Amino acid sequence: SGLQFAVLDGQGFIPFSRV
């Protein structure tokens, strides 16, 4: 339960959630 966002990695965007 928290904000959902994505991070840009060498292979592309990796979406993940964090509290």
UniProtKB/Swiss-Prot annotation:
It is found in: Secreted. Its main location: secreted. The keyword Lyase does not apply. Keywords: Amidation, Neuropeptide, Secreted. It comes from the Eukaryota. One of its GO terms (biological process) is neuropeptide signaling pathway. The modification Valine amide is found at V19. Belongs to the periviscerokinin family. Mediates visceral muscle contractile activity (myotropic activity). This is CAPA-Periviscerokinin-2. It comes from Karoophasma botterkloofense. The lineage of its organism: Eukaryota, Metazoa, Ecdysozoa, Arthropoda, Hexapoda.
